[in-house]
């Protein structure tokens, strides 16, 4: 069966609304692509993280009257005079297989690999975390997750306790446990994140060492040797008192989900309690690390 695809260049503020509307008018699937043609698979819990230049790609049945679709989009003001869009017929494919073929094991630091479950692990002697991409939360494909994974790989986690604040898929907590941590705690505001983290921990054989809490249910006296938070700059600054209290004396902290342009304001908030290391940047994102003084 053939399909017709419409690809519309959009802004991050319109993309989600446009996606919902395309589904309403008959699209069988809608995906987001960044300007480099990369699928956007890694939202933070509770949101779809989109870049300023986002393409919305919708598939329709081959019999669809695409002029009618365009007219509806114009009527809803998702297409205006300056809009850039492209319509093309595409061949039928095994979409699931093609999607799976795009994902390969990824290495972070010296020891750590994140591997899709359908791939062979490249090094059986390495620290391998089995995690499937494209589910709801982070799987290592985004620079902020990669920065956090590399930081965890650089630490001596043997017999340490770890808190993953804003755990999403649980990838950071699970990686820490695989890297030698004694125990870990995942905290999130989203019940789906708690469920995803639990399932992923079971898949990796570490569920007995991972505790999971919704934010409002976390123990008041909870502390750890290592705290990592891959959320956003605004919440990191707002939650400084909460996050600071999670770190044991002489414990270390890793923060990401921060644009490089936001680093100084986040550093200002945390420098009052932490000795901060140089900011690590990747693409437009960064990681801030430090030790509680």
From Swiss-Prot:
It catalyses: L-lysyl-[protein] + 3 S-adenosyl-L-methionine = N(6),N(6),N(6)-trimethyl-L-lysyl-[protein] + 3 S-adenosyl-L-homocysteine + 3 H(+). Its main location: cytoplasm. S-adenosyl-L-methionine binds at residues 145, 166, 188, 230. InterPro entries: Ribosomal_L11_MeTrfase_PrmA, Ribosomal_PrmA_MeTrfase, SAM-dependent_MTases_sf. Coiled coil: none annotated. It holds the Pfam family PrmA. It is an enzyme of class 2 (transferase). It is found in: Cytoplasm. GO terms for biological process: methylation. GO terms for molecular function: protein-lysine N-methyltransferase activity. NCBIfam families: prmA. This is Ribosomal protein L11 methyltransferase. It comes from Pasteurella multocida (strain Pm70).
